[in-house]
């Protein structure tokens, strides 16, 4: 009621759905006035309605089927289809794109399987995921009860997905998928390091990496970051540039590892000497002083947002700084790896810039702190 009142206060219509005893197996009860009929009818005005939700298991299918029941009670011959990107039904089961989907849903324990219903109905091999295939007999029975007959013979029939036809560079898709699998792995192991939970997900991701024929060193950025960390004794970041080269950045007296990396990466894509000091001391020192003297920070080093602000200020009077700043767009889509878990501030800024971030699952200091 609190949430519904809040929505009403914002002028957002809200409808209630109720628990149905025996859902989803008691088809006769579900498709009745005591099942879907209890749910409040959502009135629509357009011929095509998109139903979206925050994530898996949040009620999209149940909402659609409930609406089908009400629409047919109102005499409207409504239908339902799902727009779902992954898995890609007409790519092989072991294609890295489909394996990457398993990595993305490792917390749900989703697995890609052959759609046995589609194979039986059409003698064609297609890929779907286990939850849809397992639930299809129930979904088909519900639709038969509502519509009189099911328009679909398989879970694949229910989907609209043209991704497989849109691939123009299969090698690029395979590489990007493998990178995504590795990123999912490091996100999971970092979560275990932070929270102490999620070991099962990590174990599944290890199996998924083996299935894809890769390991955690797939990105050259990882070995570059860890190697330089051994040489410098401090946190290091590394990034794979658009030209395939790898640039690193280490923690210094003025900049954190993420800030140092972003500056070196910008210099690289802008053709500026990496040894050149682009940001003036006059731009850095006031920010450091503000942090330590007035904002209570013990870390005088600039985070990435502060570094980019200092670079922006300097660019007003320096052509070189302006040139370096203009390289930001070229970093979108690059992969970065850090030898320690970086701060949420740095990670947020890098993600806003479109940079993919992975971290070794360890903190910079005392085993559980980052600065």
For the regions a protein language model found, what residue spans apply to each?
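A short, polar/charged loop-to-alpha-helix boundary motif
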Residues: 254-270
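Short HxH-centered metal-ligating active-site micro-motif
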Residues: 268-300
């Amino acid at each position: 009621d609190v949430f519904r009142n809040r929505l009403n206060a914002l002028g957002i219509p809200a409808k209630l759905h109720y628990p149905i005893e025996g859902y989803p197996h008691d088809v006769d009860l579900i498709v009745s006035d005591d099942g879907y009929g209890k749910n409040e009818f959502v009135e629509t005005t357009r011929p095509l309605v998109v139903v979206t939700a925050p994530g898996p298991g949040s009620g999209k299918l149940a909402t659609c089927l409930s609406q089908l029941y009400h629409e047919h009670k109102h005499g409207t011959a409504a239908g339902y289809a799902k727009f779902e990107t992954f898995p890609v039904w007409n790519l092989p089961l072991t294609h890295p794109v489909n394996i990457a989907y398993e990595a993305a849903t490792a917390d749900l324990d989703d697995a890609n399987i052959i759609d046995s219903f589609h194979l039986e109905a059409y003698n064609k091999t297609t890929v779907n995921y286990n939850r849809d295939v397992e639930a299809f007999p129930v979904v088909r029975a519900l639709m038969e009860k509502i519509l009189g007959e099911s328009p679909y013979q398989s879970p694949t029939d229910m989907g609209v997905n043209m991704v497989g036809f849109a691939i123009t560079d299969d090698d690029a898709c395979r590489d990007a998928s493998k990178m995504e699998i590795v990123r999912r792995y490091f996100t999971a192991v970092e979560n275990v390091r932070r929270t102490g939970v999620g070991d099962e997900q990590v174990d599944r991701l290890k199996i998924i990496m083996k299935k894809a024929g890769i390991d955690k060193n797939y990105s050259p950025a990882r070995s570059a970051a860890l190697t330089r960390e051994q040489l410098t004794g401090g946190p290091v970041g590394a990034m794979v540039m658009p030209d395939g080269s790898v640039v690193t950045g280490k923690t210094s007296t003025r900049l954190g590892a993420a800030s140092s990396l972003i500056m070196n990466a910008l210099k690289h894509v802008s053709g500026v000497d990496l040894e050149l000091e682009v940001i003036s001391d006059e731009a850095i020192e006031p920010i450091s002083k503000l942090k330590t003297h007035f904002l209570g920070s013990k870390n005088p080093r600039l985070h990435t947002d502060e570094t980019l602000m200092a670079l922006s200020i300097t660019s007003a009077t320096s052509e070189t700084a302006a040139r370096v700043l203009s390289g930001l767009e070229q970093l979108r889509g690059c992969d970065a790896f850090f030898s320690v878990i970086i701060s949420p501030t740095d990670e947020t800024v890098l993600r806003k810039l479109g940079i993919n971030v992975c971290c070794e699952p360890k903190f910079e200091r005392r085993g559980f702190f980052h600065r």
